[in-house]
Curated annotation (Swiss-Prot):
Secreted arabinofuranosidase that causes degradation of rice cell wall components during infection. Required for virulence. PANTHER family: GLYCOSYL HYDROLASE, HYDROLASE, FAMILY 43, PUTATIVE (AFU_ORTHOLOGUE AFUA_3G01660)-RELATED. This is Alpha-L-arabinofuranosidase B. Belongs to the glycosyl hydrolase 43 family. Residues 45-342 are annotated as: Catalytic. Residues 359-467 are annotated as: ABD. Keywords: Carbohydrate metabolism, Glycoprotein, Glycosidase, Hydrolase, Secreted, Signal. It comes from the Eukaryota. The gene is abfB. GO terms for molecular function: alpha-L-arabinofuranosidase activity. It comes from Pyricularia oryzae (strain 70-15 / ATCC MYA-4617 / FGSC 8958) (Rice blast fungus). Organized into two domains: an N-terminal catalytic domain and a C-terminal arabinose-binding domain (ABD).
Length: 486
């Protein structure tokens, strides 16, 4: 039987077209492929680190920066892999106690390489905890930001001297922009925060006036607090996508999405459209609450885009959410729909990252859940096509089981030639556990793929059908019994 490591290796080989990474996204008109190999991360990645960012440097190393619960310093860690950041040593980059720049909160640091220098943007309280404004550090003297010499460039001056935070920078068609959240005296009597955008004249100065690209004007953005914050810009498939977070920093915290054409005038507010509904929200089934303040990076093999965000593992918080330290850094693969738009899915459960099973017979189809039935599906919500590979499986050594991501505790189960989704986590019935188990072998029609023999029905394999057709187990040896993992 093939090991999980071998299956992931085969899956990587089977990808015919490499997905252009976010790091490559500045190239004009990137091509689109919705296919990319699976990733093998384990959540939670870093405990008690909020507002996370992971940057993959050109040397292949990953750098991690985030808000610490004490809100008093900027720390950084590095590793050769995303998973390696989980246990990497942290290094102090800047401490409020060693500076005269401010006395208040230190929030949401971000690391960026601009030219041959490093920059860290974060919110710093000037004269009081909540008197926050965007602040900039410049790192020089080393291609490694952990070894750079850091100097304070100061606060960024915006159009209004009001509460402002979460500065981020991105480049589109050779023009560098800054986006940030700020209380706008022209909206909600100066309450809440809107998202602003401006061109930059240098890494610590914007060209004024700025524009507003989003206000908290939807009901889901106004729960607890009227908030748009934590933006992140990326260019893909001829579009500029800006993710952001909304509402109070409890279980109501969620993510929205702004979109503009890459060649549009980004300084024209009319160029931007907003998602009607949030694109990433709390999920009780997976026990992840308040997901948000996202950033994006690329996988270790450079073939998948990776969503970086924070969430809590419980819903109810005692006291002020800001005083709660349990926002955890998490990572998961970002998928792309055939129309070129991102599908964020749901916050996946703790533990190993799930996979998708793409049919070798029709590579637009996936094993998925539709109307509580296991079917071959096309363009389904990504969470309905994700399964965690449990190894050893419920049937014991030498087997694996497929646990639904959207419905944890439910597994693919084969009986009498059909496949269903069954609740089996706590069952001691050996027959039921065997029915929910498979043996993994090299792809029957393509050795770079993988096939799954039923542990309960020897010689019968998991088989895909046409779009909307039931997934079954049968003694097939063709492409319909071979899958590629994503």
């Amino acid at each position: 039987m093939l090991s999980l490591k071998a299956v992931l290796r085969f899956a990587s080989v089977a990808v015919a077209v490499v997905l252009p990474t976010l790091a490559q996204a500045q190239a004009p008109e990137p091509s689109l492929s919705v296919r990319s190999p699976p990733v093998s991360y384990n959540n939670t990645l870093v405990k008690q680190r909020a507002d996370p960012q992971i940057l993959k440097h050109t040397n292949g190393r990953y750098y991690f920066i985030a808000t610490v619960p004490e809100y008093d310093r900027v720390v950084m860690r590095q590793a050769d892999s995303i998973q390696g950041l989980s246990t990497a040593e942290e290094r102090l980059i800047w401490a409020r106690s060693q500076s005269k720049a401010g006395v208040g909160y230190v929030w949401a640091p971000e690391l960026h390489k601009i030219g041959d220098k490093w920059y860290i943007y974060f919110a710093l309280g000037r004269t009081a905890p909540f008197d926050v404004r965007p602040f900039v550090l410049e790192g020089t003297g080393s291609d490694d930001p952990m070894a750079a010499s850091w100097a304070e460039k100061g606060f960024i001056t915006t159009d209004f001297d009001t509460f402002s935070l979460d500065a981020t920078t991105f480049e589109v068609n050779g023009v560098r922009y800054l986006s940030w959240a700020q209380a706008d005296p022209r909206f909600d009597n100066g309450g809440g925060t809107s998202l602003f955008l401006a061109r930059m004249t240098n890494p610590w100065t914007i060209q004024r006036p700025s524009i507003v690209i989003s206000r908290p004007d939807q009901p889901w953005e106004r729960i607890g607090h009227n908030v748009n914050e934590g933006s992140w810009g990326m260019v893909r498939n001829g579009k500029v996508f800006v993710t952001y977070s909304a509402a109070a920093t409890d279980a109501n915290y969620c993510m929205g999405l702004l979109t503009a054409d890459q060649n549009a005038d980004l300084m024209n507010p009319a160029s931007w459209s907003k998602s009607k509904d949030p694109v990433f929200v709390s999920n009780t089934a997976t026990s992840q609450f308040g997901p948000g303040h996202s950033a994006f990076t690329v996988s270790d093999d450079n073939q998948s885009d990776v969503l970086v965000y924070h969430a809590r593992q419980y819903k109810d918080i005692r006291g002020e959410p800001l005083d709660n330290p349990d926002r955890m850094t998490r990572v998961q693969k970002l998928y792309w729909r055939s129309d070129g738009t991102p599908d964020f899915g749901i916050p996946i459960p703790d533990g190993p990252h799930p996979v998708r099973l793409r049919s070798s017979a029709d590579q637009t189809l996936y094993v998925g859940i539709a109307n509580n039935a296991v079917q071959s599906v096309k363009d389904a919500p990504v969470q309905n096509t994700q399964f965690k590979i449990v190894e050893p499986g419920l049937g014991g050594s030498g087997t694996i089981s497929f646990e639904s991501t959207a419905q944890p505790g439910k597994y693919l189960s084969a009986a009498n030639g059909s496949v269903s989704l069954a609740t089996l986590s706590n069952t001691s019935d050996a027959g039921a556990r065997s029915s929910a188990s498979f043996r993994r072998v090299a792809g029957l029609s393509d050795a770079t793929g993988v096939s799954f023999e039923s542990a309960a029905q020897a010689g019968s394999y998991l088989v895909s059908g046409g779009n909307g057709a039931a997934v079954s187990v049968a003694p097939s040896t063709g492409a319909e019994a071979t899958f590629y993992l994503e």
